Design a protein with these regions (language model features):
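Hydrophobic faces of well-ordered beta-strands that scaffold small-molecule active sites
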Residues: 1-3, 28-30, 50-56, 79-81, ...
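Active-site clefts of carbohydrate-active enzymes
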Residues: 179-189, 219-238
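A short, acidic, amphipathic alpha-helical segment used as a generic capping/interface helix at domain edges
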Residues: 162, 196-220
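Active-site acidic/histidine proton-transfer and metal-coordination neighborhood
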Residues: 51-139, 148
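Acidic/histidine-rich catalytic cores of soluble enzymes
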Residues: 106-191
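N-terminal pre-domain/capping segments
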Residues: 1-72, 76, 254-272
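Generic structural signal for well-ordered alpha-helices
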Residues: 13-18, 38-42, 64-69, 94-101, ...
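Aromatic-rich peripheral "rim/lid" segments of glycoside hydrolase catalytic domains that contact
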Residues: 229-272
Length: 272
């Protein structure tokens, strides 16, 4: 919820949390690399019956240990791990993933590895090779980076859909932003973006349906509306963003809730 406006102050943390609560979000992503910050935010969320994911960015296997210790104290639905390493060879990734998975198992905490820019998972094909090595690897899917990174031809063909679907079939959480094949974040409200909105809604529907087939009856699927400030957000010549990201996030929340409700209703009719 950073604003990064030259002529306006950032919203205070208390204001941000109240906005999230009052807008009807179920929870938030919380940086667990700062214990004091995490304690303050999770105290608010817990007090209002909300949930959270613990976000971290380890550069070593042992970097995950204090995060898991903090989760043991503060709780979390799961740890969202951005693998902040960039090995050139697949074999160099294996010790990191094996180590993080071992620590997660020992702690009894679910850890999801995020597909993210400038991380181990930044490249689509490289990530698919990781899934070859770890078929049960739990991902948090932000597929905006893959659309831009591969610059898929438009309309996206079935072969490229299949590559994205494979990532989504390993995903236990979603980070949501709408991209085009050339911009990693675009407003879902602009008329010229509706083809891209439909593309991502289709991918997210696939992800939700895939997750519902795999998850237990009491499991929770988190969808984080993750709309970043500039340079993620596109700006005009005056440096101002072309859309209101907070309003875009509210629109995305409602779109996903509507999608979820439709899927649940369709599954219920099919089971009747």
């Amino acid at each position: 919820m950073e604003r990064r406006l030259a002529n306006e102050a950032e919203w205070p943390l208390a204001t941000q949390l109240a906005m999230i609560r009052d807008a009807g979000f179920d929870g938030a992503g919380v940086r667990f690399i700062d214990p004091a910050f995490a304690a303050e935010v999770t105290s608010f969320l817990r007090g209002h019956g909300m949930i959270w994911q613990a976000q971290c960015y380890p550069t070593t296997v042992d970097d995950l240990k204090p995060v898991l210790e903090l989760v043991a104290r503060l709780g979390a639905d799961h740890v969202n791990l951005q693998p902040n390493v960039r090995p050139y060879r697949l074999q160099e990734c294996i010790p990191y993933l094996e180590g993080w998975r071992r620590l997660a198992d020992e702690a009894g905490v679910a850890v999801h590895v995020e597909t993210h820019r400038d991380r181990m998972t930044t490249d689509l094909f490289f990530t698919l090779h990781l899934l070859d090595c770890f078929p049960d690897l739990r991902l948090t899917a932000d597929v905006s980076h893959y659309l831009v990174g591969r610059e898929f031809a438009w309309p996206v063909d079935e072969a490229n859909h299949a590559l994205i679907h494979r990532v989504l079939d390993n995903s236990w959480g979603i980070h949501g932003r709408v991209a085009s094949r050339e911009q990693v974040q675009i407003s879902p409200g602009f008329p010229q973006h509706q083809g891209w909105v439909a593309l991502f809604m289709g991918w997210w529907e696939y992800a939700i349906r895939s997750w519902r087939r795999r998850a237990g009856p009491d499991a929770i699927l988190t969808f984080l509306c993750e709309l970043g400030p500039p340079p993620y957000a596109i700006t005009g010549p005056d440096g101002a963003e072309l859309s209101d990201r907070w309003q875009d996030a509210l629109v995305m929340k409602d779109m996903i809730r509507t999608l979820w409700d439709r899927i649940v209703a369709e599954d219920a009719r099919s089971a009747a």
